[in-house]
């Protein structure tokens, strides 16, 4: 059996340094006035989605999970600082790290993607408990049938989750790949695993991409796409 491996590099690799301009905390903002358009903070998101008064319920039963598929790790000190500045001076938010398939974690080497994901998830869902999965492997590892093979991060992550007695009700990941780059068989297997999570009452959110929905080319070089 021949294994084919593709290494996907996230678009945030060369991201610019965030603006250092101070922003008012969420609790001090006038919710009828839109926040600065050149910054995306928790205030920006709560204004756009009109969720100023939202308070997470049943936080002793619910949980929010975030997947990390590359060595881009969050940092507790950074999270505490972010929450104090942008989430009504809350400073006790934490997250649990779970390693899957040999995934690593180095709190002394935080990266943009890891910090961004855990910080915004925590700010918008606090005090709901947060779990960070660090998944080892590579993106798009498939055999000569086109199906995902051991070592594929999505396959390893799905199989791990489905083997747990309890799974967070909401899961978010900002990693993905273009549909045209996936064999049909690969996509079908992963779709069935998604369905199994859905059958257990789990909602899985995926980012639309750094440039928004429809920014990529859905047609491959060898034929039309995407898969229907």
Task: Give residue spans per PLM region.
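Substrate-binding/charge-relay-adjacent region of secreted/lumenal peptidase catalytic domains
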Residues: 1-228
